[in-house]
């Protein structure tokens, strides 16, 4: 299996070794933060092996979350090092050896607070959300984002990506496993930090989602948890609801059940047609998705026990 970094500016595993623990008078408490992800078939002792290795590497474990679903193991570890304790070569080499021994995929992503976040946009064919995000990029409203590419299972939105001078990647999605493998390879090559689903109309597998835990933002056309699924506007219209809304949320392995980041709604006027409802909803979708992306980029979201708190 493999181990590597997806953080721009940091390179792949195999960084310059630590410089020793001499006292640095100008910054005596400088720390480096990283996220480690572990994915593979479940087996005994994985958590112990990883945490013991991090202890030997003088890492401080800030948070750890692991789960097993249908025999598939995933773990995310938030770690930090004092500047003088971090030997990137040793950490990278050790994680690579553990990945091979455990037959798992292990990745480490270092976080640089001042670096812009590499963003991938995924969309299918509806342009309204993608155009709103691209417009915000052009106007400078998303200065903390570093837009890297637009990825789609169709080609309708390619001209819009090209007009914004972003690479457009087309991946057919008839075979989900193969498509996701290709998409993950592209995202890794572009060193993506987080993903925005601007009306991407394909369901992502747990194998994909686990690699970007709380780093995939989706917009859904209903006030979740009401009306999940692809026909939310029609369901709301047929049931005669008086208020219709949209929800931006993190993507999890359970469809439309991820932690909710932001919501907005509008009143349904008498005699309003389904077409009019969809048009009004799409405006809210674009605005609410952009709001969620801004909150994420400004690190104002705290996810705890499946809920999001704005900080």
Annotate each predicted stretch with a short phrase:
Residues 162-190:
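Adenosine-nucleotide cofactor-binding segment
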Residues 175, 179-181, 190-311:
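Donor/substrate-binding cores of folate-linked one-carbon enzymes
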Residues 145-156:
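Short internal beta-strands
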Residues 26-117:
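A conserved regulatory-domain signal marking ACT and ACT-like small-molecule sensing domains
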Residues 128-141:
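Histidine-anchored nucleotide/phosphate-binding helix
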Residues 119-129:
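Short, glycine-rich nucleotide/cofactor-binding loops
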């Amino acid at each position: 299996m493999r181990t590597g970094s997806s953080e721009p500016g940091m390179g792949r595993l195999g960084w310059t070794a630590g410089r020793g623990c001499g006292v640095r008078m100008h910054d005596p408490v400088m720390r480096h933060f990283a996220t480690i992800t572990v994915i593979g078939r479940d087996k005994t002792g994985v958590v112990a092996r990883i945490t013991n290795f991090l202890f030997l590497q003088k890492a401080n474990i800030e948070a750890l979350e692991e789960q097993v679903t249908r025999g598939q193991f995933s773990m995310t570890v938030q770690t930090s090092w004092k500047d003088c304790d971090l030997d990137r070569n040793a950490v990278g080499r050790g994680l690579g050896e553990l990945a091979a021994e455990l037959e798992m995929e292990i990745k480490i992503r270092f976080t640089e607070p001042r670096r812009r976040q590499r963003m991938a946009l995924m969309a299918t064919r509806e342009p309204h959300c993608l155009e709103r995000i691209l417009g915000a990029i052009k106007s400078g409203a998303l200065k903390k984002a570093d837009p890297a590419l637009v990825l789609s299972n169709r080609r309708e939105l390619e001209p819009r990506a090209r007009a914004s001078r972003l690479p457009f990647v087309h991946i057919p999605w008839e075979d989900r496993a193969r498509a996701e493998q290709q998409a993950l390879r592209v995202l890794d090559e572009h060193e993506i930090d987080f993903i925005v689903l601007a009306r991407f109309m394909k369901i992502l597998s747990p194998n994909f989602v686990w690699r970007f835990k709380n780093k995939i933002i989706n917009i859904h056309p209903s006030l979740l948890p009401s009306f999940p699924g692809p026909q939310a506007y029609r369901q709301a219209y047929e049931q005669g609801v008086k208020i219709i809304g949209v929800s931006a949320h993190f993507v999890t392995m359970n469809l439309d059940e991820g932690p909710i980041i932001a919501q907005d709604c509008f009143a349904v006027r008498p005699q309003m047609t389904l077409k009019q409802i969809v048009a009004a909803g799409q405006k809210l979708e674009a605005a609410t998705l952009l709001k969620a992306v801004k909150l994420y980029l400004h690190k104002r979201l705290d996810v705890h026990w499946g809920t999001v708190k704005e900080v």
